[in-house]
Amino acid sequence: RDIAITGFMLFCGLRSREVINLKSDDIGITEGQVLIHGKAGKERIVPLPKDLIAAFERYINLERPKTDSPHLFVVLKGPHRGLPLTHCAIRKIFRYHRKISGVSNANPHRFRHTFGANMTRAGISLPMLMKLMGHTDVRITMRYVNLFAQDIKDEFNKAIANLRTREIINGTKS
């Protein structure tokens, strides 16, 4: 379960609230996508990476208790077994994994920032990233891009190489 939860945050850019609000019907395995119920009742469709589908299926088939809850992620044991996870439960899950892993700065929202930075490094356009993250203003999306000096240098070098191949720098074309 915890792998699937972090996968939705890290590989789909979901907010913790969006993860705990996921229902089984929101997942389209065949289509490879998930319907997200975002802020202010706005919906968006986000693609599901194959690795995340595998983690999701392991959770459903091996861990998720039988329950009438339509929520995808539920409590696995104890008196609240089968009830939907809460924000508090997500915080406890992350606290537990920080403790056993020694990674002190891992939190749900940092995974969303990592998603934004990784997608940018992979070359996704800013308007596309904005849609995936459920933003209505590109300025908000820019907060998640997290460009580092090396990222800027790499992009600059790619642009220079592109100009060279078009012979603009060499002065033969303008």
Predicted regions and their residues:
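Short, leucine-enriched amphipathic alpha-helices that occur as contiguous helical runs
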Residues: 1-3, 87, 91, 112-113, ...
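Basic, Lys/Arg- and aromatic-enriched nucleic-acid-binding interface segment
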Residues: 1-16, 42, 67
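C-terminal catalytic core of tyrosine-transesterase DNA break-rejoin enzymes
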Residues: 7, 11, 112-136, 143
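Conserved tyrosine-mediated DNA breakage-rejoining catalytic core shared by Y-recombinases
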Residues: 12, 16-17, 21-55
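Active-site/catalytic core of tyrosine-dependent DNA strand-transfer enzymes
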Residues: 50-103
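Catalytic tyrosine of NAD(P)H-dependent dehydrogenase/reductases that use a Tyr as the general acid/base
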Residues: 83, 108-109, 144
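Catalytic-site neighborhood detector that most strongly recognizes the C-terminal catalytic loop/helix
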Residues: 133, 138-158
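C-terminal secondary-structure termini that scaffold catalytic or DNA-interacting sites
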Residues: 159-174
